[in-house]
């Protein structure tokens, strides 16, 4: 039994195999190639697992799930945080030929119900430490509403659903049965913030290539010691190169519950971390901690800081090598496929001011206008892409696929970009982040980047607010070091030489900005704040 998904046209699949992108290996090869190694694969608090132990634990769990009736071709819904059991579970399911959805630990009932409705899972794996599963009320309701679920395993459970017992039970003559390499290996989550959460089917072939090529570009080796402080289940933390890249190279993943400086700085020093990945808000927190007296000496081992998940302002980018003391690598990717990196030997100008260029020579990327026509080089428009690791359709979502892809299979991500003569991409924002003020278009990220130049501004987010006359006006939400008045903000922006219509109509100074599950500023929540104030 195979999972239905939109396949690449045969001529593309043939080309990707001929060029060596697709090697027809199961994703489990990332782990099993090191199955005899006693090198440390994962450190989780005071626990550590060698590659041999990680592989054996995955075999044990897979064998236990098979005994409970879980079969190849089925699906699973998994919600675990930054714990070693996430990787054990992931590889166990892949060894069984079961395709999981890895829900983020911050997801709640709405997201879990949406995912379960789409994949109809046979298996649920979750954690008693999550508020939803701390008792049995939600669990019982969830299993009753999603009747496909036959097996439940729970981390930190002392009863019949004990995941740890299943992991510890010895595998009895277990033989792995991963799905074929051109079939769905697991589902990634769309980064969209509107409508029903969409699922992205990834195959062994396309995802393994993405990980393998990322390892080459980022030069991960057995000596790589990677701190995973962003959500471990997120695509960025899994594959860019992420934990899977570390495992492929034979290095060590150190898990952290969150990216706070108070937690991460001591871990970096203790475990001699040499690479980690953050989102821009976390970078700001680290820089702020250093400004407020945290010792930079704790970060002496750190050689590479990857920043992705959202656009990094040039102002913040320039501060990383100067204040943290390591190399910056910008990462612009998407769970749907395409990944761009600044290269380790790029000039400072490229690293600070661009988001890099695509991984693969067969990544086809161009810029379109609103009607889907190609734009000249350097102009800002919609990103269009297809390639050997970019998907061809959301799972069970024909209506959305009709608008997300053009007739030639190019995916429109909704990102607004420009491409320079050397092929480097600069992200200018998102279509939905564009504010239409009386017919004048304002790219929110342009104004946010200017606001971040102000010495008193720590974070900035520009959102639209409804206006009867203009249609939309803009509101700047700021987290500041010292009080700022709207007149001061506008004066500063005028000094940057921007048009008057781009000045924020309203300025709100707040203690913090709300974040989505993957660490991006939650602009939907900010707009709701505005709407609630307007109606009060």
From Swiss-Prot:
Q: Which GO terms describe its biological process?
A: enterobactin biosynthetic process
Keyword list, A-Z: Acyltransferase, ATP-binding, Enterobactin biosynthesis, Ligase, Membrane, Nucleotide-binding, Transferase
Task: Tell me which CDD domains the record gives.
Answer: 23DHB-AMP_lg
One GO cellular-component annotation of the UniProt record comes to: membrane
GO terms assigned for molecular function:
2,3-dihydroxybenzoate--[aryl-carrier protein] ligase; 2,3-dihydroxybenzoate-serine ligase activity; acyltransferase activity; ATP binding
User: What is the superkingdom listed in this entry's lineage?
Assistant: Bacteria
This entry's Enzyme Commission designation comes to 6.3.2.14, 6.2.1.71
In this chain, substrate is annotated as bound at: 235, 240, 309, 331, 335, 415, 432, 441
Residues of the region (Phosphopantetheine binding) are 438-439
Protein's pathway = Siderophore biosynthesis; enterobactin biosynthesis
Localization, UniProt: Membrane
Induction line: Under conditions of iron deficiency and by the fur protein.
What catalytic activity does the UniProt entry give for this protein? 3 2,3-dihydroxybenzoate + 3 L-serine + 6 ATP = enterobactin + 6 AMP + 6 diphosphate + 4 H(+); 2,3-dihydroxybenzoate + holo-[ACP] + ATP = 2,3-dihydroxybenzoyl-[ACP] + AMP + diphosphate; 2,3-dihydroxybenzoyl-5'-AMP + holo-[ACP] = 2,3-dihydroxybenzoyl-[ACP] + AMP + H(+)
Query: By its UniProt entry, which PROSITE patterns does this protein fall under?
Result: AMP_BINDING
Q: Which Gene3D superfamilies match?
A: 3.30.300.30, N-terminal domain of ligase-like
* InterPro entries xrefs: AMP-bd_C, AMP-bd_C_sf, AMP-binding_CS, AMP-dep_synth/lig_dom, ANL_N_sf, ATP-dep_AMP-bd_enzyme, DHB_AMP_lig
Look up keyword Transferase and say if it applies: yes
| Assembly description | Proteins EntB, EntD, EntE, and EntF form a multienzyme complex called enterobactin synthase. Monomer. EntA and EntE interact together.
What the record says about family reads: Belongs to the ATP-dependent AMP-binding enzyme family. EntE subfamily.
Q: State its role.
A: Involved in the biosynthesis of the siderophore enterobactin (enterochelin), which is a macrocyclic trimeric lactone of N-(2,3-dihydroxybenzoyl)-serine. The serine trilactone serves as a scaffolding for the three catechol functionalities that provide hexadentate coordination for the tightly ligated iron(2+) atoms. EntE processes via a two-step adenylation-ligation reaction (bi-uni-uni-bi ping-pong mechanism).
**Per its record, how is this protein called by name?**
Enterobactin synthase component E
Recorded source organism is: Escherichia coli O157:H7
Originating gene: entE
């Amino acid at each position: 039994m195979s999972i239905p998904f939109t396949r690449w046209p045969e001529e593309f699949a043939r080309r990707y195999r001929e060029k060596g992108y697709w090697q027809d290996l199961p994703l489990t090869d990332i782990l099993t190639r090191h199955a005899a190694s006693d090198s440390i694969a994962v450190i989780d608090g005071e626990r550590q697992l060698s590659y041999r132990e990680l592989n054996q634990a995955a075999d044990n769990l897979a064998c236990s799930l098979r005994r409970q009736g879980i079969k190849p071709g089925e699906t699973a819904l998994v919600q675990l945080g930054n714990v070693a059991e996430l990787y054990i579970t992931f590889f166990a399911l892949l060894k069984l030929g079961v395709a999981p959805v890895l829900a983020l630990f911050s997801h709640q009932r709405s997201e879990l119900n949406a995912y379960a409705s789409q994949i109809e899972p046979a298996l649920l794996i979750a954690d008693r430490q999550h508020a939803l599963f701390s008792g049995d009320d939600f669990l019982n309701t969830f299993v009753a509403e999603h009747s496909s679920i036959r097996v439940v395993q729970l981390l930190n459970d002392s009863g019949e659903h004990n995941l740890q017992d299943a992991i510890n039970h010895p595998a009895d003559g277990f033989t792995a049965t991963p799905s074929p390499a051109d079939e769905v290996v697991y589902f990634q989550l769309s980064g969209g913030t509107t409508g029903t959460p969409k699922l992205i089917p990834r195959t062994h072939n396309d995802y393994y290539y993405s990980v393998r090529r990322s390892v080459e570009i980022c030069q991960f080796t057995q000596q790589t010691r990677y701190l995973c402080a962003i959500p471990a289940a997120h695509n960025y933390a899994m594959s860019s190169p992420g934990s899977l890249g570390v495992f492929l190279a034979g290095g060590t993943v150190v898990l952290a519950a969150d990216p706070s400086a108070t937690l991460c700085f001591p871990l970096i020093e203790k475990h001699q971390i040499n690479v980690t990945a953050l989102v821009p808000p976390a970078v700001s927190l680290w820089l702020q901690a250093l400004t407020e007296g945290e010792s930079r000496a704790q970060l002496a081992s750190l050689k590479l800081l990857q920043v992705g998940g959202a656009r990094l302002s040039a102002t913040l980018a320039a501060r990383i090598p100067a204040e943290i003391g390591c190399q910056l690598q910008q990462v612009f990717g998407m769970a749907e496929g395409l990944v761009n990196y600044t290269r380790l030997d790029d000039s400072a100008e490229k690293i600070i001011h661009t988001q890099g260029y695509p991984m693969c020579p067969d990544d086809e990327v161009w810029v379109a206008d609103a009607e889907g026509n190609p734009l000249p080089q350097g102009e800002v428009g919609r990103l269009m892409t297809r390639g050997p690791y970019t998907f061809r359709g959301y799972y069970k979502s024909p209506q959305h696929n009709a608008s997300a892809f053009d007739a030639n299979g190019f995916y429109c991500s909704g990102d607004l970009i420009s491409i320079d003569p050397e092929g480097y991409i600069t992200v200018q924002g998102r279509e939905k982040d564009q504010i239409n003020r009386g017919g004048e278009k304002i790219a929110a990220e342009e104004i946010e980047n200017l606001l971040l130049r102000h010495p008193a501004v720590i974070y900035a987010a520009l959102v639209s607010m409804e206006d009867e006359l203009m249609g939309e006006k803009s509101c700047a939400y700021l987290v500041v070091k010292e009080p700022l008045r709207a007149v001061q903000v506008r004066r500063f922006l005028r000094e940057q030489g921007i048009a008057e219509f781009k000045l924020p109509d309203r300025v709100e100074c707040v203690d913090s900005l709300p974040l989505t599950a993957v660490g991006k500023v939650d602009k939907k929540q900010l707009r709701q704040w505005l709407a609630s104030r307007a109606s009060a």
